[in-house]
């Protein structure tokens, strides 16, 4: 017999009755039923009920066991007594009558229970992550994550992609966030950086004659904590292809992402044919470049109906050309109580309020706005929005660049409050035609809007003749249920265009050469047109596991202060290590 087990804790069935077996695992739960001791033994594969009675030679040993002790149990498989089957367990028709117990690893008093799914403070869960990971839901999430990554690899290979690994130690580059720096012992005063993404390497692979690359890549960014991103590191499905247009990338990646979602959607519908939504259209209709298309509401510009109207607040705003009035339809929301609730919510968001119109029987408009603009304009708005009696509309006004985020929040709030959002689906879409540049108010300069290596639509002509803020890029995102799950673009593969693109953002030619020397040199020796994308593994897993917290799908995450409470990182290091790296600490005063 094997030293530790003949079967796993999830393997025993009716066919094993009367066999002598050996199992090992953790004492998940111990119950004393009037002299009978029941031990639910758990391992990675499942749960098996084990029983000892006072006549069992192992009864005294069984009485000593406590939760999460690791034990080896020998015994005979028998049918559970009639009426005690557990249909929720694959092993639920049988039990082991214990003949021998060996304690392999006792456990101290538990700082958090493994049995059950009670909420515990995050710092306790992270400090004792090895216990937390034993809990069923988190354990299953991690297994699902592994299966999703396997499915990604399988589907990428079916599409003709090859997996390569790019370096982890690289040069620092301005890709939008701070780098994690690694000092060089051999070259004092110089630093490596952990890659924010394999961006340059994957483009260099295309210039090296490879085609259709992918990897499940670790990425590192020294960013301030954010609710939707884990501190420190994350993983992405990184992709690059040679001799492709934007449509080629879409044709290759839609089946991969759709297929992965279908594999793990548990029967929920997944978008088959993805809509392509231009960036500015997405902002106008949904108030965000990450639209949740499960919400059917689309905002409309209704400025013409308020221009010169009796509602002076909006009418005066519209005298400035940049200002607009947007309407958010609220089908079924035409009650005073709901409209007042939305108005109070808006005030809680720091807004002066949320204007509204309700439509009553006969499509008569009601509310302060309707009274001020009159029945003709009110009816025109109703028709434009496709509303009817019992519906409402809500209005935001001003400079869209300033109110668009709030408008998007209001659209989401209306959809949630009126139960219009179908939570049982995965709504995927492409968002396309991103602006190449944006104006950085803090630095008072034009800056890259997204990826600095994207090809501008119009190429070199656009860079030399257009207002930079009007240039669009061959850049695209994949969105799902209000999350950005992937981003990519067709790359700028001409050296003169690369230099010009960076020049507009304030980088001199020599600085470009210094920072991106490897890629700049490669551009001089025959660079193919190429493009690709990167999909966020963590966010995709989060969506498919049905959680809103990235820590629920990650093995050993840091907390929001970028601390690893289990391993004690970041930590001080020995003075000898600092001397070897020629580093002297200059700490801020506390």
UniProtKB/Swiss-Prot annotation:
What does the UniProt keyword field contain?
A: Aminoacyl-tRNA synthetase, ATP-binding, Cytoplasm, Ligase, Nucleotide-binding, Protein biosynthesis
Cellular component terms, GO, for this chain's entry? cytoplasm
What family does the entry list? Belongs to the class-II aminoacyl-tRNA synthetase family. Type 1 subfamily.
Choose any GO biological process term that the UniProt entry carries and state it: aspartyl-tRNA aminoacylation
According to the record's subunit comment, the protein's assembly and interactions are: Homodimer.
Binding residues for L-aspartate: 175, 221, 450, 491
Disulfide bond residue pairs: none
UniProt catalytic activity: tRNA(Asx) + L-aspartate + ATP = L-aspartyl-tRNA(Asx) + AMP + diphosphate
- What does UniProt list as this organism's lineage? Bacteria, Pseudomonadati, Pseudomonadota, Alphaproteobacteria, Hyphomicrobiales
* Listed EC numbers: 6.1.1.23
Record gene name: aspS
| Name of the protein | Aspartate--tRNA(Asp/Asn) ligase
Stretches for region Aspartate: 199-202
Provenance organism: Rhodopseudomonas palustris (strain HaA2)
Enumerate the SUPFAM superfamilies for this protein: Class II aaRS and biotin synthetases, GAD domain-like, Nucleic acid-binding proteins
Protein role: Aspartyl-tRNA synthetase with relaxed tRNA specificity since it is able to aspartylate not only its cognate tRNA(Asp) but also tRNA(Asn). Reaction proceeds in two steps: L-aspartate is first activated by ATP to form Asp-AMP and then transferred to the acceptor end of tRNA(Asp/Asn).
Gene Ontology terms for molecular function = aspartate-tRNA ligase activity; aspartate-tRNA(Asn) ligase activity; ATP binding; nucleic acid binding
Q: Which residues bind ATP?
A: 221-223, 484, 536-539
Q: Which residues cross the membrane?
A: none
Q: Where in the cell is it found?
A: Cytoplasm
Query: Site: Important for tRNA non-discrimination. Where?
Result: 33, 83
């Amino acid at each position: 017999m094997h030293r530790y087990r003949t079967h796993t804790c999830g393997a025993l069935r009716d066919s094993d009755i009367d066999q002598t077996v050996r199992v090992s695992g953790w004492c998940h739960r111990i119950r004393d039923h009037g002299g009978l001791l029941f031990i639910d033994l758990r391992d990675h594969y499942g749960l098996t009920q084990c029983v000892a009675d006072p006549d069992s030679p192992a009864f005294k040993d069984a009485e000593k066991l406590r939760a999460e002790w690791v034990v080896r149990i020998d015994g005979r498989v028998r049918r559970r007594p009639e009426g005690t089957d557990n249909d929720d367990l694959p092993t639920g028709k049988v039990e082991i009558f214990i003949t021998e117990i060996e304690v392999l690893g006792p456990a101290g008093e538990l700082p958090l229970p493994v049995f059950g799914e009670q909420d515990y403070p995050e710092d306790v869960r992270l400090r004792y992550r090895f216990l937390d990971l034993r809990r069923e839901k988190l354990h299953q999430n991690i297994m699902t994550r592994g299966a999703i990554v396997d499915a990604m690899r399988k589907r990428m290979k079916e599409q003709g992609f090859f997996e390569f690994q790019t370096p982890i130690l690289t040069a620092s580059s301005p890709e939008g966030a701070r780098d994690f720096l690694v000092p060089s012992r051999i070259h004092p005063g110089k630093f490596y950086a952990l890659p924010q993404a394999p961006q340059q390497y994957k483009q260099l692979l295309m210039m090296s004659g490879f085609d259709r690359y992918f990897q499940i890549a670790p990425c590192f960014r020294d960013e301030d904590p954010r609710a939707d991103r884990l501190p420190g590191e994350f993983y992405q499905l990184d992709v690059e292809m040679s001799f492709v247009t934007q449509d080629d990338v879409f044709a290759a990646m839609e089946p991969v992402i759709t297929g992965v979602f279908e594999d793990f959607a548990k029967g929920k519908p997944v978008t088959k044919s993805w809509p392509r939504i231009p960036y500015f259209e997405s902002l106008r209709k949904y108030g965000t470049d990450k639209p949740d298309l499960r919400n059917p509401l689309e905002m409309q510009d209704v400025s013409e109906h308020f221009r010169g109207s009796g509602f002076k607040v909006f009418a005066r705003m519209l005298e400035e050309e940049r200002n607009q009035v947007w309407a958010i339809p609220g089908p079924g929301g035409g009650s005073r109580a709901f409209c007042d609730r939305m108005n109070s919510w808006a005030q809680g968001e720091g807004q002066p309020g949320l204007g509204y119109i309700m439509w009553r029987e006969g499509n008569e408009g009601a509310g302060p706005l309707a009274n001020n603009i009159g029945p003709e304009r009110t009816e025109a708005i109703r028709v434009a929005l496709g509303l009817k009696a019992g519906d409402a509309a809500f209005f935001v006004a001003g400079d869209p660049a300033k109110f668009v985020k709030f408008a998007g929040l209001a659209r989401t709030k209306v959809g949630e409050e009126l139960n219009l959002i179908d939570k049982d689906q995965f709504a995927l879409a492409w968002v396309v035609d991103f602006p190449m540049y944006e104006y950085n108010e803090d630095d008072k300069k034009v800056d890259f809007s997204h990826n600095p290596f994207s090809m501008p639509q119009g190429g070199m002509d656009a860079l030399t003749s257009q207002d930079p803020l009007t240039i669009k890029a061959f850049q695209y995102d994949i969105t799902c249920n209000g999350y950005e799950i992937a981003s990519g673009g067709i790359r700028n593969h001409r050296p003169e265009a690369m230099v010009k693109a960076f020049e507009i953002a304030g980088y001199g030619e020599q600085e470009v050469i210094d920072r991106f020397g490897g890629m700049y040199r490669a551009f001089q020796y025959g660079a193919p047109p190429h493009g690709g994308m990167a999909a966020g593994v963590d966010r995709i897993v989060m969506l498919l596991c049905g959680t809103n917290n990235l820590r629920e799908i990650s093995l050993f995450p840091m907390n929001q202060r970028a601390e690893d409470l289990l391993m004690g990182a970041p930590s001080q290091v020995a003075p000898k290590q600092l001397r070897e790296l020629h580093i002297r600490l200059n700490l801020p005063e506390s």
